[in-house]
Structures are given as structure tokens and as C-alpha cells.
Amino acid sequence: MQPAMMMFSSKYWARRGLSLDSAVPEEHQILGGLTQNKATASKSEDKRSGKDTSESSKTAVVFSLKNEVGGLVRALRLFQEKHVNMLHIESRRSRRRSSEVEIFVDCECGKTEFNELIQLLKFQTTIVTLNPPDNIWTEEEELEDVPWFPRKISELDRCSHRVLMYGTELDADHPGFKDNVYRQRRKYFVDVAMGYKYGQPIPRVEYTEEETKTWGVVFRELSKLYPTHACREYLKNFPLLTKYCGYREDNVPQLEDVSMFLKERSGFTVRPVAGYLSPRDFLAGLAYRVFHCTQYVRHGSDPLYTPEPDTCHELLGHVPLLADPKFAQFSQEIGLASLGASDEDVQKLATCYFFTIEFGLCKQEGQLRAYGAGLLSSIGELKHALSDKACVKAFDPKTTCLQECLITTFQDAYFVSESFEEAKEKMRDFAKSITRPFSVYFNPYTQSIEILKDTRSIENVVQDLRSDLNTVCDALNKMNQYLGI
């Protein structure tokens, strides 16, 4: 039987303003006596009573008691009397009655002992739940007041289908507003995106001659500017997309090919989307290294202009940089910072996203270069942003988040960073100002989000870090041996 483990956090109690806080030193002393001799006492008593401890298993109970001095000690003495080994204890203010607190006890015992314990607890406490999952408070009740966000990658299906404006809902000033053929084509792309679910291959599209021609014009004209206007990371990946994904003037690349390429390069994938998503839903995708991507092509009457993101914007603007590991991490961290954040904070993050990943500039070899997708997919604004006419400011999330985002005209200001790494570090510092009662961790093995708000959840992450550090140390030792250091 393992020694009992007690977790009392003075910060935890103080945060809730419980009167029980004043009793913690006294009760802690008593409880210390309970737990110090617990393993030995349990073993000896089990031997005398002839109970079989080999059938012990882990279980849990949540009970509610009045917020008064001595109440917790009286309840926990019952665990000792029934030889129930306490592994972990947490507490919080009761959501049912403000005058009570709820106690979560993770314990180890036999079925008989547990049933006897519950019968005794019922006389002193109110049983809330028995044998709950390990995450009963952190994943369910503790997140009741937090805006919903996907906890696993498959839940992005829910985000992707909450489209604010569908591709068929064109404004009167849209080039394709009066083109019924174009509108029907857009409806087809909506149906494809709305029917897609996580884990499926992205449906391949047979683009029309008109759509391929429009793509070709955009591809050809932008390709002339990239050598002098795009950042080096973009220029490094663009030829690879030509080689592996069919980036050519006479061919519109397929999202499935692009997604597989990105997965190998940076861990990102793309999935089709029917239209505009809310900032919260779009950023949630980035947290999982998933980029929501349109498949429709802009109207052919004006190939060099589009009032909305289309596949030319996605494939030529975003994809080449999503293949860069550092840029991919920068994008993901913005997404992670948005999970569970308030509407106000999400809007600030979305604005920072807009002026970096969409319209960001960086310095390379003493020259301004574009890395924002909105610039790299717009001939006119790409030229303007790197000209003397543009207003360029240093990127600072605290001030950038207040800048107005313009959709139909050039931006009033553009923001420059020395590197992706600098922009990422500034965003990390900015993310610390976001009010959120927990931190999040992306588990790449299960492709899920873990909530970090107690010692147990943090310990799991630390174990992963230790494993990574051991690998690094082993590699360094072998290098030193090889170099004779």
C-alpha cells in the first residue's frame, strides 16, 4: 500500500476566501498524524481483521460539507477507520451551496471498505458523486464559465461547420454577384466543405477551365514579385510546393496533396471550410496545427482582386510559410493562447494575427520582406507595403492589437519584426496578460488539449520534458565523445 499523499495549497484556499483557511494549520497538523502512520496502521489492522488488501483498487468520491473548523478532519478520520488509503485531495467552494465546500478524494481500497466508508460519510456529509473520472472538476464543472473550445482534434468538425457567411452569400459589390453559374459553383464548394469530417481525405476537385485560367493569372503575376518581396522562408518552400504539390500556372493544387506535404514539413494540416469562421473558431484550429482553407477560386472577371479569401490566397499566401517549422509554431501559439480566453482577448489575438500572419513584415539582410499571406497573395498591396508610401511600425502586440483592420483597402499601417522568433517571444509575453484560470498544453501524441491547473496535470507535462531532455543530454554526450571533449 502506497503512503498517503495530501495536497493542501495555501494559495488555493486563500483564492477562495474560505474561513476554513484559518483552520488549515491545525487541521494540517492533525491530518499529518493521520497520514504519517497510515500505511503501517492499515497493514497491521488488515492483518488482524484478515482482510485481503490485494483486491484494493483506485476509486474516488466527492462529498460536500459545511465550511466550519474541524469538519474536514472529522470526515477524513472515517477514511482512516475504514483503512482507505488517500492518494490525493482537492477542495473548492460548492456550486450548490455557498456555505459549503466540496472535497474530492482520490483513494485506494477494497470494495467492502469503500462501501462501508460511504455509509458513514452519509451521516456527516452530502455525497455529490462516487467514482468520478480523474478529470471531473478540471474538464467539466471547472470549465462551466469558460467559453467552449475543442479538447481534441476531431472536435474541430464543430468549429468548421459554424460558418458565419457561406460562399454563396455574395455581397452586391462582389464580382460574381450577378453570375448565376459562379454562384452555383460556389454552392458546390460549400457542400464539399460542410460534408467533410476529421480523418477523411479531402475531396479532390476538378477545376474548370475558367478557374484554372484565373489561378494561372494570379500565380504568374505574383511569381514575378516573390524574389524581391517575399521572405527567405517563403522562397525556400515555394519550389518544394512546385515539386511535390503541383504548384504550376496551368494547375490548381489539391488540398489533400498540400495537407500531406505540410504534415511532413511542420506538422500542420489543412481542412476545407465553407466560408468565414469566427476568430475564436479559426484560431482554435491553429492550436491543433490545422488551417481552415477555402477551395473556391475568385471570379474570373477580375483575377487580381478578391473581397474574400479564396484558394489563391490560401495556397499562395499561407501554405508556403506554414511549411516552415518556426512559423508553424508561431501560428500554433496564437491559437493556443485563444483557447478559453474571453471575447475581448480573442479579438486582441485575432488582430495580432491579422497584422502578422496576414500582413506582417520582417527584416532580412537589411531589407523589408513580406511574410503575411494577405500581402503575398495581393500584387497591389505587396508592392505598396514595401514602398516608401507605406507606414511601417515595430510590432508590439500591446499596441498592434488596437490597430484597425481594413478589409477592402490597403492597411493604414504595417508591423515589422526582426524575425519570427522575435514575434513569437513577444506574443508569448502578451499571452501572459490574458485572463484565464488555467494554462493549456497540446499533446502531439493524442492530438488533444490538456488543461494545466493542478500538480497532477503539470506532472504529466514534466515527464514528457524529462524524456526530451534525456534525449538531448544523450546526444550531447555522444557528440562530446566523438569530438574527444
UniProtKB/Swiss-Prot annotation:
One of this protein's GO BP terms?
circadian rhythm
Q: Which PROSITE patterns match?
A: ACT, BH4_AAA_HYDROXYL_1, BH4_AAA_HYDROXYL_2
Q: Which GO terms describe its cellular component?
A: neuron projection
Cofactor(s) essential for the protein: Fe(2+)
Q: Which InterPro entries match?
A: ACT-like_dom_sf, ACT_dom, ArAA_hydroxylase, ArAA_hydroxylase_Fe/CU_BS, ArAA_hydroxylase_sf, Aro-AA_hydroxylase_C_sf, Aromatic-AA_hydroxylase_C, Trp_5_mOase
Q: Where is this region: Disordered?
A: 32-57
Q: Can you give the residue ranges of the ACT domain?
A: 60-135
Q: Which GO terms describe its molecular function?
A: iron ion binding; tryptophan 5-monooxygenase activity
The family this protein is said to belong to:
Belongs to the biopterin-dependent aromatic amino acid hydroxylase family.
Q: What is this protein called?
A: Tryptophan 5-hydroxylase 2
What's the source species for this entry?
A: Rattus norvegicus (Rat)
Lineage in the entry?
Eukaryota, Metazoa, Chordata, Craniata, Vertebrata
